[in-house]
Protein backbone atom coordinates (compact mmCIF):
# COMPACT_ATOMS: atom_id res chain seq x y z
CA UNK A 1 0.00 0.00 0.00
CA UNK A 2 1.07 3.59 -0.63
CA UNK A 3 0.08 4.62 2.88
CA UNK A 4 -1.27 3.11 6.04
CA UNK A 5 -3.38 5.00 8.54
CA UNK A 6 -4.43 3.97 11.99
CA UNK A 7 -7.77 4.82 13.61
CA UNK A 8 -8.77 4.31 17.23
CA UNK A 9 -12.14 4.47 18.99
CA UNK A 10 -13.05 4.52 22.66
CA UNK A 11 -16.14 2.96 24.21
CA UNK A 12 -16.32 4.28 27.79
CA UNK A 13 -17.24 0.95 29.37
CA UNK A 14 -15.27 -2.02 30.65
CA UNK A 15 -14.70 -5.00 28.40
CA UNK A 16 -16.83 -7.39 30.48
CA UNK A 17 -19.74 -4.97 30.68
CA UNK A 18 -19.53 -4.45 26.94
CA UNK A 19 -19.72 -8.23 26.51
CA UNK A 20 -22.98 -8.30 28.45
CA UNK A 21 -24.37 -5.37 26.43
CA UNK A 22 -23.54 -7.24 23.21
CA UNK A 23 -25.16 -10.47 24.47
CA UNK A 24 -21.92 -12.40 24.42
CA UNK A 25 -21.65 -12.72 28.22
CA UNK A 26 -23.87 -12.97 31.25
CA UNK A 27 -23.12 -12.57 34.93
CA UNK A 28 -24.00 -15.03 37.68
CA UNK A 29 -22.97 -14.57 41.30
CA UNK A 30 -20.43 -11.94 40.27
CA UNK A 31 -18.80 -14.25 37.75
CA UNK A 32 -18.93 -13.84 33.98
CA UNK A 33 -19.82 -16.63 31.59
CA UNK A 34 -20.22 -17.03 27.84
CA UNK A 35 -23.91 -17.01 26.92
CA UNK A 36 -24.08 -19.86 24.38
CA UNK A 37 -27.87 -20.37 24.53
CA UNK A 38 -29.13 -16.83 24.13
CA UNK A 39 -30.65 -16.50 20.69
CA UNK A 40 -32.06 -13.00 21.16
CA UNK A 41 -29.98 -10.24 19.58
CA UNK A 42 -28.75 -7.77 22.18
CA UNK A 43 -29.32 -4.05 21.63
CA UNK A 44 -27.99 -2.53 24.85
CA UNK A 45 -24.60 -1.91 23.24
CA UNK A 46 -26.23 0.63 20.93
CA UNK A 47 -26.71 2.94 23.87
CA UNK A 48 -22.97 3.21 24.41
CA UNK A 49 -21.19 6.23 22.87
CA UNK A 50 -18.28 5.55 20.53
CA UNK A 51 -15.63 8.25 20.69
CA UNK A 52 -12.96 8.70 17.97
CA UNK A 53 -9.40 8.99 19.31
CA UNK A 54 -6.20 10.37 17.80
CA UNK A 55 -3.49 7.78 17.16
CA UNK A 56 -0.04 9.12 18.11
CA UNK A 57 3.32 7.50 17.51
CA UNK A 58 6.68 8.07 19.18
CA UNK A 59 9.17 10.02 17.06
CA UNK A 60 11.83 8.10 15.21
CA UNK A 61 14.80 9.74 13.47
CA UNK A 62 12.87 10.20 10.24
CA UNK A 63 9.98 11.91 11.99
CA UNK A 64 12.31 14.18 13.96
CA UNK A 65 14.10 15.21 10.77
CA UNK A 66 10.84 15.81 8.91
CA UNK A 67 9.37 17.93 11.71
CA UNK A 68 12.60 19.96 11.92
CA UNK A 69 12.96 20.50 8.18
CA UNK A 70 16.26 18.60 8.14
CA UNK A 71 16.90 16.88 4.82
CA UNK A 72 20.33 15.34 5.47
CA UNK A 73 20.98 12.72 8.15
CA UNK A 74 24.27 14.36 9.06
CA UNK A 75 27.65 12.81 9.79
CA UNK A 76 28.91 10.31 12.28
CA UNK A 77 30.38 12.89 14.60
CA UNK A 78 32.35 13.40 17.78
CA UNK A 79 31.75 16.42 19.97
CA UNK A 80 34.53 17.28 22.41
CA UNK A 81 33.17 19.24 25.36
CA UNK A 82 29.76 18.72 26.97
CA UNK A 83 29.70 22.06 28.72
CA UNK A 84 27.30 24.95 28.29
CA UNK A 85 27.68 25.34 24.52
CA UNK A 86 28.32 21.68 23.70
CA UNK A 87 25.26 20.44 25.60
CA UNK A 88 23.06 23.03 23.87
CA UNK A 89 24.33 21.99 20.42
CA UNK A 90 23.70 18.31 21.10
CA UNK A 91 20.20 19.06 22.37
CA UNK A 92 19.36 20.94 19.16
CA UNK A 93 20.87 18.36 16.82
CA UNK A 94 19.58 15.40 18.80
CA UNK A 95 15.96 16.54 18.76
CA UNK A 96 16.13 17.23 15.03
CA UNK A 97 17.69 13.85 14.20
CA UNK A 98 20.83 15.36 12.66
CA UNK A 99 24.02 13.36 13.07
CA UNK A 100 25.04 10.31 15.08
CA UNK A 101 27.03 11.58 18.02
CA UNK A 102 29.65 10.53 20.50
CA UNK A 103 30.42 13.11 23.19
CA UNK A 104 33.79 13.23 24.98
CA UNK A 105 34.24 15.05 28.29
CA UNK A 106 35.94 14.14 31.55
CA UNK A 107 34.42 16.92 33.66
CA UNK A 108 31.57 16.68 36.20
CA UNK A 109 28.48 18.79 36.76
CA UNK A 110 29.12 21.34 39.49
CA UNK A 111 26.50 23.50 41.23
CA UNK A 112 27.45 26.67 39.34
CA UNK A 113 27.03 24.87 35.99
CA UNK A 114 23.25 24.73 36.41
CA UNK A 115 22.82 28.42 35.54
CA UNK A 116 24.01 27.70 31.98
CA UNK A 117 23.64 23.99 31.30
CA UNK A 118 20.84 21.61 30.41
CA UNK A 119 21.55 19.54 33.53
CA UNK A 120 19.38 19.55 36.65
CA UNK A 121 20.21 19.60 40.36
CA UNK A 122 19.90 15.82 40.51
CA UNK A 123 22.86 15.59 38.11
CA UNK A 124 25.38 17.40 40.33
CA UNK A 125 28.46 15.22 40.65
CA UNK A 126 27.71 13.16 37.54
CA UNK A 127 29.92 13.34 34.46
CA UNK A 128 28.81 15.84 31.85
CA UNK A 129 29.08 13.35 28.98
CA UNK A 130 26.81 10.87 30.77
CA UNK A 131 24.30 13.57 31.72
CA UNK A 132 24.04 14.88 28.16
CA UNK A 133 23.55 11.35 26.82
CA UNK A 134 20.88 10.69 29.45
CA UNK A 135 18.97 13.87 28.66
CA UNK A 136 18.98 12.93 24.99
CA UNK A 137 17.67 9.46 25.82
CA UNK A 138 14.86 11.00 27.89
CA UNK A 139 13.78 13.07 24.89
CA UNK A 140 14.19 10.49 22.13
CA UNK A 141 13.21 7.21 23.87
CA UNK A 142 15.72 5.16 21.93
CA UNK A 143 15.00 6.60 18.48
CA UNK A 144 18.61 7.79 18.43
CA UNK A 145 21.35 7.74 21.02
CA UNK A 146 24.36 9.75 22.08
CA UNK A 147 27.35 7.68 23.16
CA UNK A 148 29.18 9.17 26.16
CA UNK A 149 32.94 8.83 26.57
CA UNK A 150 34.25 9.99 29.94
CA UNK A 151 37.85 10.83 29.05
CA UNK A 152 40.27 13.59 28.19
CA UNK A 153 39.73 14.37 24.51
CA UNK A 154 43.41 15.28 24.13
CA UNK A 155 44.47 11.75 25.10
CA UNK A 156 44.43 10.31 21.59
CA UNK A 157 46.04 7.10 22.86
CA UNK A 158 43.07 6.35 25.13
CA UNK A 159 41.14 3.48 23.55
CA UNK A 160 37.63 4.98 23.71
CA UNK A 161 38.82 8.34 22.40
CA UNK A 162 40.79 6.75 19.57
CA UNK A 163 37.88 4.51 18.61
CA UNK A 164 35.39 7.38 18.57
CA UNK A 165 37.60 9.58 16.39
CA UNK A 166 38.48 6.70 14.06
CA UNK A 167 34.80 6.08 13.36
CA UNK A 168 33.88 9.72 12.83
CA UNK A 169 33.65 11.82 9.69
CA UNK A 170 33.59 15.05 11.68
CA UNK A 171 34.88 16.19 15.07
CA UNK A 172 33.63 19.38 16.68
CA UNK A 173 35.63 21.08 19.39
CA UNK A 174 33.39 22.85 21.92
CA UNK A 175 35.86 22.42 24.77
CA UNK A 176 36.42 26.19 25.34
CA UNK A 177 40.17 25.57 25.69
CA UNK A 178 43.01 25.81 23.19
CA UNK A 179 44.66 22.52 24.11
CA UNK A 180 42.39 20.23 22.08
CA UNK A 181 42.21 22.12 18.74
CA UNK A 182 45.96 22.74 18.73
CA UNK A 183 46.74 19.13 19.60
CA UNK A 184 44.31 17.81 16.98
CA UNK A 185 45.94 19.99 14.32
CA UNK A 186 49.20 18.03 14.44
CA UNK A 187 47.60 14.58 14.06
CA UNK A 188 47.21 13.67 10.40
CA UNK A 189 44.93 10.67 10.91
CA UNK A 190 42.04 12.54 12.54
CA UNK A 191 38.82 13.45 10.70
CA UNK A 192 37.84 16.93 9.60
CA UNK A 193 37.61 19.28 12.58
CA UNK A 194 35.47 22.30 13.43
CA UNK A 195 35.96 24.50 16.48
CA UNK A 196 33.17 26.60 17.99
CA UNK A 197 33.10 28.94 20.93
CA UNK A 198 31.23 31.85 22.43
CA UNK A 199 33.21 34.92 23.49
CA UNK A 200 33.51 35.65 27.22
CA UNK A 201 30.63 38.13 27.36
CA UNK A 202 28.41 35.96 25.16
CA UNK A 203 27.92 38.65 22.53
CA UNK A 204 29.77 36.82 19.76
CA UNK A 205 30.14 33.31 18.42
CA UNK A 206 32.99 31.94 16.33
CA UNK A 207 33.14 29.02 13.90
CA UNK A 208 36.47 27.75 12.61
CA UNK A 209 36.00 24.97 10.05
CA UNK A 210 38.77 22.99 8.40
CA UNK A 211 38.44 22.19 4.73
CA UNK A 212 37.36 18.66 3.83
CA UNK A 213 40.94 17.56 3.03
CA UNK A 214 42.37 19.18 6.20
CA UNK A 215 44.83 21.29 4.25
CA UNK A 216 43.93 24.27 6.48
CA UNK A 217 43.73 23.08 10.06
CA UNK A 218 42.39 24.66 13.21
CA UNK A 219 45.88 25.85 14.15
CA UNK A 220 46.15 28.22 11.19
CA UNK A 221 42.48 29.21 11.31
CA UNK A 222 43.00 30.27 14.92
CA UNK A 223 45.98 32.44 13.93
CA UNK A 224 44.07 34.01 11.04
CA UNK A 225 41.16 34.75 13.37
CA UNK A 226 43.56 36.57 15.72
CA UNK A 227 44.96 38.59 12.81
CA UNK A 228 41.45 39.73 11.92
CA UNK A 229 40.90 40.80 15.53
CA UNK A 230 44.09 42.88 15.41
CA UNK A 231 43.48 44.46 12.02
CA UNK A 232 39.70 44.89 11.83
CA UNK A 233 37.70 47.55 13.63
CA UNK A 234 35.19 45.03 15.01
CA UNK A 235 38.06 43.23 16.75
CA UNK A 236 38.44 46.12 19.19
CA UNK A 237 35.51 44.97 21.38
CA UNK A 238 35.07 41.39 20.19
CA UNK A 239 36.65 39.73 23.25
CA UNK A 240 35.60 42.32 25.82
CA UNK A 241 34.79 40.77 29.17
CA UNK A 242 37.52 38.14 29.30
CA UNK A 243 38.75 39.60 32.60
CA UNK A 244 35.30 39.51 34.27
CA UNK A 245 35.45 35.88 35.34
CA UNK A 246 34.35 34.45 38.65
CA UNK A 247 36.27 31.25 37.87
CA UNK A 248 39.80 31.07 36.54
CA UNK A 249 39.63 30.39 32.82
CA UNK A 250 42.14 28.74 30.56
CA UNK A 251 41.79 30.92 27.48
CA UNK A 252 39.84 33.60 25.66
CA UNK A 253 37.17 30.95 25.09
CA UNK A 254 36.38 30.32 28.75
CA UNK A 255 32.76 31.15 29.59
CA UNK A 256 32.77 30.61 33.36
CA UNK A 257 31.78 34.19 34.05
CA UNK A 258 28.75 36.39 34.61
CA UNK A 259 26.48 35.87 31.60
CA UNK A 260 22.80 34.95 31.05
CA UNK A 261 22.02 31.51 29.66
CA UNK A 262 19.95 33.17 26.94
CA UNK A 263 23.16 34.31 25.22
CA UNK A 264 24.49 30.76 25.12
CA UNK A 265 21.23 29.44 23.69
CA UNK A 266 21.03 32.22 21.11
CA UNK A 267 24.58 31.63 19.89
CA UNK A 268 24.11 27.85 20.01
CA UNK A 269 21.06 28.13 17.75
CA UNK A 270 23.07 30.10 15.20
CA UNK A 271 26.04 27.74 15.37
CA UNK A 272 23.89 24.60 15.16
CA UNK A 273 22.41 25.68 11.82
CA UNK A 274 25.66 27.13 10.47
CA UNK A 275 27.61 23.97 11.24
CA UNK A 276 25.05 21.96 9.31
CA UNK A 277 25.62 24.26 6.33
CA UNK A 278 29.42 24.21 6.72
CA UNK A 279 29.52 20.41 6.67
CA UNK A 280 28.18 20.50 3.12
CA UNK A 281 31.04 22.79 2.05
CA UNK A 282 34.46 21.54 0.98
CA UNK A 283 36.39 24.71 1.82
CA UNK A 284 37.65 26.10 5.11
CA UNK A 285 35.62 28.72 6.93
CA UNK A 286 36.27 31.44 9.51
CA UNK A 287 33.01 33.13 10.49
CA UNK A 288 32.12 35.40 13.39
CA UNK A 289 28.69 36.54 14.55
CA UNK A 290 28.79 39.76 16.61
CA UNK A 291 25.59 40.61 18.45
CA UNK A 292 24.50 44.04 19.67
CA UNK A 293 23.06 43.29 23.13
CA UNK A 294 21.16 46.58 23.25
CA UNK A 295 19.07 46.00 20.11
CA UNK A 296 19.65 42.33 19.33
CA UNK A 297 21.08 42.93 15.86
CA UNK A 298 23.80 40.62 14.53
CA UNK A 299 26.71 41.41 12.22
CA UNK A 300 28.45 38.59 10.37
CA UNK A 301 32.18 38.77 9.62
CA UNK A 302 33.81 36.32 7.21
CA UNK A 303 37.60 36.05 7.26
CA UNK A 304 39.07 34.50 4.08
CA UNK A 305 41.03 31.38 5.02
CA UNK A 306 44.44 31.05 3.38
CA UNK A 307 47.02 28.22 3.32
CA UNK A 308 49.86 27.95 5.82
CA UNK A 309 53.36 26.56 5.63
CA UNK A 310 55.47 24.79 8.23
CA UNK A 311 59.15 25.55 8.71
CA UNK A 312 61.25 23.34 10.97
CA UNK A 313 63.39 25.37 13.36
CA UNK A 314 65.31 22.90 15.47
CA UNK A 315 63.06 21.67 18.27
CA UNK A 316 60.22 23.99 17.23
CA UNK A 317 58.05 24.12 14.15
CA UNK A 318 57.18 27.59 12.88
CA UNK A 319 53.84 28.11 11.18
CA UNK A 320 53.11 31.08 8.95
CA UNK A 321 50.22 31.57 6.55
CA UNK A 322 50.02 33.28 3.18
CA UNK A 323 48.14 36.20 4.72
CA UNK A 324 51.16 37.20 6.80
CA UNK A 325 53.49 37.07 3.81
CA UNK A 326 51.07 39.07 1.68
CA UNK A 327 50.78 41.72 4.40
CA UNK A 328 54.56 42.05 4.72
CA UNK A 329 55.06 42.22 0.95
CA UNK A 330 52.55 45.07 0.74
CA UNK A 331 54.43 46.96 3.46
CA UNK A 332 57.73 46.28 1.66
CA UNK A 333 56.40 47.60 -1.64
CA UNK A 334 54.92 50.70 -0.03
CA UNK A 335 58.36 51.61 1.35
CA UNK A 336 60.29 51.36 -1.94
CA UNK A 337 63.05 52.18 -2.60
CA UNK A 338 63.87 51.96 1.10
CA UNK A 339 63.94 48.93 3.34
CA UNK A 340 61.34 48.65 6.09
CA UNK A 341 60.45 46.40 8.97
CA UNK A 342 58.76 46.04 12.31
CA UNK A 343 57.91 43.53 15.00
CA UNK A 344 56.36 40.10 14.55
CA UNK A 345 53.28 39.15 16.54
CA UNK A 346 52.38 35.57 17.36
CA UNK A 347 52.50 33.02 20.13
CA UNK A 348 54.46 30.03 21.37
CA UNK A 349 52.84 26.74 22.32
CA UNK A 350 55.37 24.37 23.82
CA UNK A 351 52.75 21.63 24.25
CA UNK A 352 52.90 21.11 20.50
CA UNK A 353 56.42 22.59 20.13
CA UNK A 354 55.30 25.36 17.82
CA UNK A 355 55.62 29.07 17.23
CA UNK A 356 52.83 30.61 15.17
CA UNK A 357 53.24 33.93 13.36
CA UNK A 358 50.00 35.93 13.37
CA UNK A 359 50.94 39.30 11.86
CA UNK A 360 53.66 41.87 11.39
CA UNK A 361 53.38 45.47 12.54
CA UNK A 362 54.46 48.30 10.22
CA UNK A 363 57.54 50.36 10.95
CA UNK A 364 57.15 52.86 13.80
CA UNK A 365 57.17 56.49 12.70
CA UNK A 366 60.62 57.19 14.16
CA UNK A 367 62.30 54.36 12.23
CA UNK A 368 65.32 55.14 10.04
CA UNK A 369 65.26 53.66 6.54
CA UNK A 370 67.36 53.85 3.38
CA UNK A 371 67.76 51.67 0.25
CA UNK A 372 70.36 49.53 2.02
CA UNK A 373 69.53 49.71 5.73
CA UNK A 374 66.73 49.83 8.26
CA UNK A 375 66.70 50.70 11.94
CA UNK A 376 63.37 50.13 13.66
CA UNK A 377 62.08 52.89 15.89
CA UNK A 378 59.95 52.62 19.01
CA UNK A 379 57.29 55.33 18.66
CA UNK A 380 53.89 53.86 19.52
CA UNK A 381 55.27 50.33 19.42
CA UNK A 382 54.55 49.36 23.02
CA UNK A 383 50.98 50.61 22.65
CA UNK A 384 50.49 48.66 19.40
CA UNK A 385 51.74 45.41 20.94
CA UNK A 386 49.60 46.01 24.02
CA UNK A 387 46.54 46.64 21.84
CA UNK A 388 47.12 43.38 19.94
CA UNK A 389 47.34 41.51 23.24
CA UNK A 390 44.16 43.17 24.51
CA UNK A 391 42.18 42.40 21.35
CA UNK A 392 43.22 38.73 21.50
CA UNK A 393 42.72 38.34 25.27
CA UNK A 394 46.45 38.04 25.85
CA UNK A 395 46.98 35.25 23.33
CA UNK A 396 49.18 37.19 20.88
CA UNK A 397 52.40 39.01 21.74
CA UNK A 398 55.89 39.85 20.57
CA UNK A 399 57.83 36.94 19.06
CA UNK A 400 60.51 38.63 16.96
CA UNK A 401 61.35 41.09 14.19
CA UNK A 402 60.86 41.33 10.44
CA UNK A 403 62.48 43.51 7.81
CA UNK A 404 62.64 43.73 4.05
CA UNK A 405 65.48 43.74 1.56
CA UNK A 406 65.44 46.29 -1.28
CA UNK A 407 64.11 45.68 -4.81
CA UNK A 408 66.01 43.04 -6.74
CA UNK A 409 67.56 41.44 -3.66
CA UNK A 410 66.89 38.05 -2.11
CA UNK A 411 66.05 37.39 1.53
CA UNK A 412 69.45 35.88 2.30
CA UNK A 413 70.62 37.30 5.65
CA UNK A 414 73.47 39.76 5.66
CA UNK A 415 76.16 39.96 8.32
CA UNK A 416 74.21 42.80 9.92
CA UNK A 417 71.07 40.61 9.97
CA UNK A 418 72.92 37.87 11.84
CA UNK A 419 74.23 40.36 14.38
CA UNK A 420 70.68 41.59 14.92
CA UNK A 421 69.52 38.01 15.44
CA UNK A 422 72.11 37.55 18.19
CA UNK A 423 70.83 40.64 19.98
CA UNK A 424 67.23 39.42 19.59
CA UNK A 425 68.12 36.04 21.05
CA UNK A 426 69.84 37.62 24.04
CA UNK A 427 66.80 39.81 24.67
CA UNK A 428 64.29 36.95 24.41
CA UNK A 429 66.44 34.71 26.63
CA UNK A 430 65.25 36.67 29.67
CA UNK A 431 61.80 35.17 29.05
CA UNK A 432 63.21 31.75 28.21
CA UNK A 433 62.04 32.04 24.60
CA UNK A 434 63.84 31.80 21.26
CA UNK A 435 63.81 34.80 18.91
CA UNK A 436 62.44 34.81 15.37
CA UNK A 437 63.80 36.95 12.54
CA UNK A 438 61.92 37.14 9.24
CA UNK A 439 63.36 38.65 6.06
CA UNK A 440 61.27 39.49 2.99
CA UNK A 441 63.14 39.49 -0.32
CA UNK A 442 62.17 40.03 -3.95
CA UNK A 443 60.86 36.51 -4.50
CA UNK A 444 61.62 34.63 -1.32
CA UNK A 445 61.19 34.77 2.42
CA UNK A 446 63.73 33.69 5.03
CA UNK A 447 62.98 32.84 8.65
CA UNK A 448 65.77 32.47 11.19
CA UNK A 449 65.65 31.43 14.81
CA UNK A 450 68.07 32.46 17.52
CA UNK A 451 68.26 30.99 21.02
CA UNK A 452 70.69 31.20 23.91
CA UNK A 453 71.83 27.71 24.91
Please annotate each region the language model reported.
Residues 170-211:
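ADP-ribose/adenylate-binding Rossmann-like module
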Residues 106-144:
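Glycine-rich phosphate-binding loop and adjoining beta1-alpha1-beta2 segment
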Residues 300-400, 406-453:
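Conserved beta-strand-loop surface patch within small alpha/beta domains used
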Residues 133-169, 175-178:
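A structured beta-alpha segment of the ubiquitous adenosine-cofactor-binding alpha/beta core
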Residues 66-108:
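Glycine-rich adenosine-cofactor-binding loop
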Residues 198-294:
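Adenosine-phosphate binding glycine-rich loop
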Residues 1-75:
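Glycine/serine-rich phosphate-binding loop and adjoining beta1-alpha1 elements at the start
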Residues 37-58, 278-334:
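Phosphate-binding loop/pocket of nucleotide- and phosphate-handling active sites
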Amino acid sequence: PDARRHRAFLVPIGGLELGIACGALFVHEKRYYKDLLNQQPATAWREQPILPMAVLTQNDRTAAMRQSGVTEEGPAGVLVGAGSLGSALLNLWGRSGWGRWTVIDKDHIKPHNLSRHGAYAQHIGETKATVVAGLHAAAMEGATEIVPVVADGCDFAQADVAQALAGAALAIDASTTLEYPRAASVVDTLPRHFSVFVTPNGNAAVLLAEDAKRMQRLRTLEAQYYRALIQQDWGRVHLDGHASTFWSGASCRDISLVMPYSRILGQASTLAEQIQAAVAREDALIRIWQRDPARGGVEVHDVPAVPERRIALGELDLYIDDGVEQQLRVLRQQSFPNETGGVLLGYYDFNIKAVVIVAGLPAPSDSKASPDSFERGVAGLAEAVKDAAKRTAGMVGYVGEWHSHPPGHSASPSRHDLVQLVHLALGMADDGLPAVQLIVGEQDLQILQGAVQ
